[in-house]
């Protein structure tokens, strides 16, 4: 059997293969209430039917002010749980594990009213200027991640991912470009890491399942975070109980990175080796042979697929065929699934 289609354990959760659907915002909430819709059900469950091992839902806001837009999913209140539970049940029906990415947009929120950030620095000249979070407000953000994690558990999710990448709130704290604070949340790397550490520890108080953290391994900007900065961050995350790091790049500033097949894989490789922690690789991974090479050369532990799963819900089936394997599909499709 190929490594791509071997099982993988995240703590006590066993994935049937190493294909993960990347969290990707769909901006499809209908009533600006954060509640998942029929679109979300069809979108995610179809990828589970296609053979994906772990489906991670898009950035789901822990506070109403933490949405990227008014059309994002949320877990800031109990009314948002039932629709997510229905979705999780659909994923489980098809043999996939269910993950959810808990997030706060910080200064990248495009919402009416006040937005917040570690420091009062806007994303760009066209963006609203955020209000600097007080220490009390930071503690409330941490508490809301904990509350959202509890609701995720109530909905039946198997895995939680904390979004610390792409220029959103936690990433804003981590990077010296966006964090100019002079208290114990700013300055040295250990201080800038504090909010993420506090969130991980708070989540673990109500959640005993695996925790993944998504990071941006480089800011692609002078004075920003580079790969070498993420090795100590990754070591601290491992010590705090994180199972795996989902390694992306960019998003903090308005810079277009160089993009080519597998362009982010070297970052996952270096963090894996430098910090001794499992990683997920992503970045234009589109074929089974490409994914298999990454795993067999121990450059990452999981393959996180984004745009290719938007184009093809049956990526897992096609990847298996490319590797000379056959995987079991939905029994309803047996006449065509060969």
Curated annotation (Swiss-Prot):
GO terms for molecular function: FMN binding; NADP binding; NADPH dehydrogenase activity. Its cofactor is FMN. It comes from the Bacteria. InterPro entries: Aldolase_TIM, NADPH_DH_bac, OxRdtase_FMN_N, YqjM-like. FMN binds at residues 22-25, 59, 101, 214, 306-307. It catalyses: A + NADPH + H(+) = AH2 + NADP(+). GO terms for biological process: response to toxic substance. Homotetramer. Catalyzes the reduction of the double bond of an array of alpha,beta-unsaturated aldehydes and ketones. It also reduces the nitro group of nitroester and nitroaromatic compounds. It could have a role in detoxification processes. PANTHER family: NADPH DEHYDROGENASE C23G7.10C-RELATED. Belongs to the NADH:flavin oxidoreductase/NADH oxidase family. NamA subfamily. NCBIfam families: PRK13523.1 (NF010047). This is NADPH dehydrogenase. It comes from Listeria monocytogenes serotype 4a (strain HCC23).
């Amino acid at each position: 059997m190929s490594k791509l289609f071997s099982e993988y354990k995240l703590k006590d959760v066993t994935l049937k293969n190493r294909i993960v659907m990347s969290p990707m915002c769909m901006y499809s909430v209908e009533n600006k209430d954060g509640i998942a819709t029929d679109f979300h059900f069809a979108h995610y469950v179809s990828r589970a039917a296609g053979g994906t091992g772990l489906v991670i839902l898009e950035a789901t806001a822990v506070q109403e002010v933490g949405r990227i837009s008014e059309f994002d999913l949320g877990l800031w209140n109990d009314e948002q749980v039932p629709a997510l539970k229905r979705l999780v049940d659909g994923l489980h029906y098809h043999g996939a594990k269910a993950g959810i990415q808990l997030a706060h947009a910080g200064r990248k929120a495009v919402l009416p009213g006040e937005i917040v950030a570690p420091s009062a620095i806007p994303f760009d000249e066209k963006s609203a200027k955020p209000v600097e979070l007080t220490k009390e407000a930071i503690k409330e953000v941490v508490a809301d991640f904990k509350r959202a994690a509890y609701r995720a558990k109530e909905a039946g999710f198997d895995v939680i991912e904390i979004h610390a990448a792409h220029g959103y709130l936690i990433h804003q704290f981590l990077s010296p470009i966006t964090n100019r604070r002079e208290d114990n949340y700013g300055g040295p790397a250990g201080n800038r890491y504090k909010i993420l550490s506090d969130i991980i520890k708070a989540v673990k108080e109500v959640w005993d399942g695996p925790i993944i953290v998504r990071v941006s391994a480089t800011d692609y900007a002078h004075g920003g975070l580079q790969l070498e900065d993420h090795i100590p961050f990754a070591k601290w995350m491992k010590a705090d109980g994180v199972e795996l790091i989902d390694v992306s790049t960019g998003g903090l500033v308005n810079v277009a990175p160089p993009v080519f097949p597998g362009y982010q894989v070297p970052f996952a490789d270096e963090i894996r080796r430098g910090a001794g922690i499992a990683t997920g690789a992503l970045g234009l991974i589109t074929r089974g042979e490409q994914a298999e090479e990454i795993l067999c050369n121990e450059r990452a532990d999981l393959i996180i697929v984004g745009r290719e799963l938007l184009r093809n819900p049956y990526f897992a089936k096609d990847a298996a065929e490319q590797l000379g394997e056959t995987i079991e599909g939905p029994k309803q499709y047996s006449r065509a699934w060969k």
